[in-house]
Amino acid sequence: MTILALGINHKTASVNLRSKVAFDDQKRQLAFEQIQHRALAESVVILSTCNRTELYFHNAEITPREEHEDNIAWREQCFEWFAEIHQLEHNELRECIYFKQNMEAARHLMRVACGLDSLILGEPQILGQVKQAYQYSENFYQSQNSHISTKLSRLFQRTFSTAKRVRSETEIGSSAVSVAYAACGLARQIFDNFGKLRFLLVGAGETIELVARYLIQHGAKNIMIANRTPQRAETLAERLNTPMQILSLSALQIGLNQADIVISSTGSPDMLISKEMVEIAQKQRQFDPMLLIDIAVPRDIDENAGELDAVYSYSVDDLQHIIQRNMAQREQAAEQAAQIVDEECKAFFEWLKQQQSSDLIKRYRQDAEQTRQELLAKALVALTSGQDSEKVLNELSYKLTNSLLHVPTQALQAMAKSGNSQGLQSFSKALKLEEQ
């Protein structure tokens, strides 16, 4: 039995190549069907994000020994299929792809789900993406009146509980390490209740979208967006499914006069909010506390605005200091998280070994039972036909003993022939022959 992780990520491949191997819904469905048709795996889970594409295969028929020719051939078949479905040259792909098996594959999956392998250390979104990937796989196999193999399913369930444990036992996700989240975290330190505050966001790009999502998530209800192109701001509001007041840049003063918190991130080469504009706004607001966070480079907000009474002003440089401090905390937490992953990975493989021994014992008992029933049936026929009962029973016991000992005897002879003294000793110890 082998679990194989095959993939590429932001560490091994460019954005261009990562985009070529991404799985949309249609290609994911095709992949499931092809893998099943070609018998590449008993089950597979496909994880596809902007930073990684990884497939987790479980094949019960493949030996776990990586150097074995069957294992090597299977890996190559998986690789060739992966190149084929994405219509890529082998050479282009081979330089960027990685294979991890069994213990390393399980550890890698757990590290991925915990955010330890992410571009932004500890980012929480990846766990949801791993769960969604598992759900896609589960849905496919259910549609085929089947299910994900027990061992692969157990690995993913263990992974989810490991990620939950990492979040609860470490500080890996407690501090912001992106500019957008750091800005919002700073706002939460200064103001308590976002639901009662008025926000002015200047710009409508990716950073402002992240800021808006964070604010909404933490209860913000009153948001204005000012942008050079109002239509882009309207599109952002629609995408966030949240009513927002849209302003043009020429109406910035109107927004400032109402805002408790201003967060700005545009690509403008010119300053958009002067100290004088903030001063006018403060008079309108009766000098209630105002927070200005300027994420833009070059600046959108006059750096001297912070000299005004009740105005708190922060720049992107201030946020970078916060991020560096938080990143150091996350790196320390990541060491704790890695220890948890190792513990959980070992625990999973202990379960797997127990499961494999249980399966082996079950098959051995089934074979023995089949032999018993076959010989018993022959003995009953002989007794019914009037043969001597003592002779029939002796023959039954003799044949049963020979049948049950035939395979173990062959194994002993093979070990003796190959000079496997350790195997012979273990066999003798298991059968308690040394004590006799």
From Swiss-Prot:
Its EC number is 1.2.1.70. The keyword NADP applies. Pathway: Porphyrin-containing compound metabolism; protoporphyrin-IX biosynthesis; 5-aminolevulinate from L-glutamyl-tRNA(Glu): step 1/2. Substrate binds at residues 49-52, 118, 123-125, 129. Keywords: NADP, Oxidoreductase, Porphyrin biosynthesis. The active site is at residue 50. CDD domains: NAD_bind_Glutamyl_tRNA_reduct. Homodimer. Catalyzes the NADPH-dependent reduction of glutamyl-tRNA(Glu) to glutamate 1-semialdehyde (GSA). During catalysis, the active site Cys acts as a nucleophile attacking the alpha-carbonyl group of tRNA-bound glutamate with the formation of a thioester intermediate between enzyme and glutamate, and the concomitant release of tRNA(Glu). The thioester intermediate is finally reduced by direct hydride transfer from NADPH, to form the product GSA. NCBIfam families: hemA. This is Glutamyl-tRNA reductase.
